[in-house]
UniProtKB/Swiss-Prot annotation:
One of its GO terms (molecular function) is phosphatase activity. Residues 291-371 form the YcgL domain. Its EC number is 3.-.-.-. PROSITE patterns: YCGL (PS51648). This is Putative HAD-like hydrolase Noc_2718. Transmembrane segments: none annotated. SUPFAM superfamilies: HAD-like, YcgL-like. CDD domains: HAD_SPP. It comes from Nitrosococcus oceani (strain ATCC 19707 / BCRC 17464 / JCM 30415 / NCIMB 11848 / C-107).
Length: 371
């Protein structure tokens, strides 16, 4: 059996188009097609807690993942039958770093540091202490001071700094040393028996840098800040230079921002996935075209239309399908939204709706002519 692919992706400004750049209209639709493939195991890796991940899935119509690594790597959920099951063994794995102290106890050690402002209670958990800070904060000098205080208590921690460019605010997460995106991904890989050659990560911001430069196959979407791009390249060891892909746009007519960049990078590492993005299936070219055909009929004149998604598909429409449908009267290059139902439309309404995206053939039993 062919090895499956583990696609791990950050959410905000990676899959979610909630930055300043414009999203390619077809990108998330192609992501949905890809996620339907049994050969793809999808894991969201986010700073969000469970409720916010679920909210993002609903708001942006994202595919339901197989796994979710939340709270910047401090929680792991397995999703089956729409039920979210936490991995308690992951909590045990990371708990030893904090010597039994929870996030509230740690916060007392930093009460006098005025640039830091505690985030809302729902953004904290037992193993995640999160602060807001000015985006211009000199974090490179501050973090060693914080680490020194924790080390004096025998506490091992990691510090994740990033900037929310939309809200223009700095974000600082303090976690058990083992609790980070990279370790959580590796824990997931080990438990689900994925090797490095069948795993890929996508991200955009400072809290993704450790994974981006880890040697795992990784994608940096095109909308990432330039300083993140430069820092990722600086951290990347020479022997891992081929493991990081910088999305640049142009793939399948997409712009490389957000999910478009994820798809572009995935196809770079796994070329076979391009066909899955187009059709969601693994059939031959003719079978793919047959599966993507749709018949639309107007109710008043009984006009019929055969829709295919791209012009190239016309040359691959199987002969048997054409025989079933009858001969073709004429061909026009028009555009269609496939999700629109035309079952009750008249001819004029059909023509208007078909002028948006795609290609169609009007069907007739009399003659065949191209225009």
């Amino acid at each position: 059996m062919k090895q499956k692919i583990l696609l791990c992706s950050d959410l905000d400004r990676t899959l979610l188009p909630n930055g300043h750049q414009a999203e390619s209209p077809q990108a998330r639709l192609r992501l949905q097609r890809l996620a339907q493939r049994p050969g793809i195991i999808l894991a969201y890796v986010s700073g969000r807690h469970k409720a916010l991940i679920q909210s993002a899935i609903r708001e942006y119509d994202l595919p339901l993942p197989d796994f979710a690594i939340g709270d910047v790597g401090t929680t792991i959920y397995q999703i089956t039958d729409n039920q979210w099951h936490p991995w308690e063994d992951w909590s045990k794995e990371i708990s030893q770093d904090w010597q039994g102290i929870n996030q509230a106890g740690l916060a007392k050690l930093f009460a006098d540091i005025t640039p830091l402002r505690l985030q809302e209670p729902e953004k904290q958990n037992r193993y995640k202490l999160s602060y807001y800070a000015p985006p211009e904060l000199d974090w490179e000098n501050l973090i060693p001071q914080l680490a020194q205080r924790l080390q004096a208590q025998g506490i091992q921690a990691s510090f994740i700094w990033s900037v929310d460019e939309t809200a223009q605010i700095g974000l600082l997460d303090i976690l058990p040393k083992r609790a980070n995106k990279l370790h959580a991904i590796r824990f997931l890989m080990e438990r689900q028996h994925f090797d490095k050659s069948h795993t890929v990560f996508a991200g955009d911001s400072g809290n993704d840098l450790e994974v981006l430069a880890s040697g795992l196959q990784a994608i940096l979407v095109r909308n990432a800040q330039e300083e993140v791009r430069q820092e990722a390249l600086r951290r990347l060891p020479p022997e891992h230079s081929q493991q990081l892909y910088l999305a640049r746009g142009g793939f399948m007519g997409l712009n490389g921002y957000y999910s478009a960049g994820v798809l572009e990078g995935l196809a770079h590492f796994f070329p076979e996935t391009r066909a899955w993005m187009e059709t969601g299936r693994e059939e031959s070219a003719e079978e793919e075209t047959a599966q993507s055909c749709a018949i639309y009929r107007s109710c008043k004149r009984n006009d019929s239309y055969l829709y295919v998604e791209s012009q190239d598909d016309f040359s691959r429409v199987p002969g048997k399908l054409l025989e079933m449908l009858g001969k073709l009267e004429f061909v026009m290059r028009l555009e269609l939204r496939p999700e629109i139902s035309l079952a009750q439309a008249n001819t004029r309404e059909v023509m208007q709706m078909l002028r948006e995206k795609g290609y169609f053939l009007q069907l007739s039993s009399r003659e065949y002519r191209r225009s």
